[in-house]
């Protein structure tokens, strides 16, 4: 008799995606982050749902409703800490997942990669509107500064900014619509993630060598379900350590003060996971130029498959490319650090040099390194 999971119309889909899925036998722990991102998304949706039951999206009561959640709601403090720090864990997994995709050449699955970039942009948008909801000082001024950048768009910029704000400045209408966006976007992310998986299962997973693994595949369960469970234990432990012992470690002290439009904080900055993009934005003295550089820094991921010039897919056996990859990683860490510093020398010039290096590496040095490697590997006799 055929197993129910193989015959039932619904269970059959789950079976093909998570149980009997043929997976390469040599994929490493770097392939854990896809499942960890799924777990992070579930944690964020569940904690967010319970927080939304007690939150009020009104400028007069938003800040006090967050305080009420932390003080008066049963385990409200835990929900809030897990949700806020869960976002940080989400982005840590996201950056590592993208980094793995670049390192091992997974971007050559173009459909999967492009949906992934759209997912990244959607998650960033969700996190941004979510950061505004507690209505603290940094929430308010972060929203004001970032949304004001829309006014740099020629002709329609000011109208567009006022349309999104729902007025002439960030106010009640902005907070209400940002809450609506923050509620609906995670479900759009779930839909995109399903499409991401659909495209991935059309081609099968890549592996560290970058070589076609069809001749040596094993079922996903039990091998990789157990491997993913280990990653899950580390994720939950890290989240609990952060959420229970240092819940405000990654936050901004200014957000403990209610939003005040008449008092500007000395240094406006977003959450740590946006600092690299914020540093790129500030590195260009021109407002429109900064906005374009900010967009280009993320959208450049879409053209990475077109810039692949090497005959080998993965960086596993390519020392020149590995060196450039780790320089790029160090450059992004530098940009993250610069984004958290005040706008003064020497931070301005360091940010500008890091910005130039970022685009130089992706657009020129990496494609040239691929061509050079091809030349070196050609037989010369």
Swiss-Prot record:
Principal location class: mitochondrion
Example GO molecular function: ubiquinol-cytochrome-c reductase activity
Superkingdom of origin organism: Eukaryota
Residues that, per the record, bind heme b b562: 83, 182
Residues annotated for a ubiquinone binding in this entry: 201
Compartments (UniProt record): Mitochondrion inner membrane
Annotated Pfam families: Cytochrom_B_C, Cytochrome_B
Binding site for heme b b566: 97, 196
Gene3D superfamilies linked to this entry: Cytochrome Bc1 Complex, Chain C (1.20.810.10)
Entry keywords, A to Z: Electron transport, Heme, Iron, Membrane, Metal-binding, Mitochondrion, Mitochondrion inner membrane, Respiratory chain, Transmembrane, Transmembrane helix, Transport, Ubiquinone
Additional detail: Heme 1 (or BL or b562) is low-potential and absorbs at about 562 nm, and heme 2 (or BH or b566) is high-potential and absorbs at about 566 nm.
Role: Component of the ubiquinol-cytochrome c reductase complex (complex III or cytochrome b-c1 complex) that is part of the mitochondrial respiratory chain. The b-c1 complex mediates electron transfer from ubiquinol to cytochrome c. Contributes to the generation of a proton gradient across the mitochondrial membrane that is then used for ATP synthesis.
Family stated for the protein in its record: Belongs to the cytochrome b family.
Name this polypeptide is given: Cytochrome b
Lineage start: Eukaryota, Metazoa, Chordata, Craniata, Vertebrata
């Amino acid at each position: 008799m055929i197993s129910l999971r193989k015959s039932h119309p619904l269970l059959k889909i789950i079976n093909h995606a998570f149980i009997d899925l043929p997976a390469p036998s040599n994929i490493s722990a770097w392939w854990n982050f896809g499942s960890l991102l799924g777990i992070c998304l579930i944690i964020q949706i569940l904690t967010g749902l319970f927080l939304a039951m007690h939150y009020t999206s009104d400028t007069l009561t938003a800040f006090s409703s967050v305080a009420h959640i932390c003080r008066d709601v049963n385990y409200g403090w835990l929900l809030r800490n897990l949700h806020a720090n869960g976002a940080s864990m989400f982005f840590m997994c996201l950056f590592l997942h993208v980094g793995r995709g670049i390192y091992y050449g997974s971007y050559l699955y173009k459909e999967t990669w492009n949906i992934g970039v759209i997912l990244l942009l959607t998650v960033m948008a969700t996190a941004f509107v979510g950061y505004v909801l507690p209505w603290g000082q940094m929430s308010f001024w972060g929203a004001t500064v970032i949304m004001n950048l829309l006014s740099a768009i020629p002709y329609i910029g000011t109208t567009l900014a006022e349309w999104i704000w729902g007025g002439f400045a960030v106010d009640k209408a902005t907070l209400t619509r940002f809450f609506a966006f923050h509620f609906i976007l995670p479900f759009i992310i779930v839909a995109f993630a399903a499409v991401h998986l659909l495209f991935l299962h059309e081609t099968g997973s890549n592996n560290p060598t970058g070589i076609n693994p069809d001749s040596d595949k094993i079922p996903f369960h039990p091998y990789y379900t157990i491997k993913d469970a280990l990653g899950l234990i580390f994720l939950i432990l890290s989240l609990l350590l952060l959420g229970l012992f240092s819940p405000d470690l990654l936050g901004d002290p200014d957000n403990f003060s209610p939003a005040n439009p008449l008092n500007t904080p000395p240094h406006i900055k977003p959450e740590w996971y946006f600092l690299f993009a914020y540093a790129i934005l500030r590195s260009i003295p021109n407002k429109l130029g900064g906005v374009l550089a900010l967009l280009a820094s993320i959208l450049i991921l879409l053209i990475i498959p077109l810039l692949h010039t090497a005959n080998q897919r993965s960086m596993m056996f390519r020392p020149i490319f590995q060196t450039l990859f780790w320089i790029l990683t160090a450059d992004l860490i530098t940009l993250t650090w610069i984004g958290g510093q005040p706008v003064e020398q020497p931070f301005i010039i360091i940010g500008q040099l890091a910005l130039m290096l970022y685009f130089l590496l992706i657009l020129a040095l990496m494609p040239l390194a691929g061509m050079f490697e091809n030349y070196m590997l050609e037989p010369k006799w």
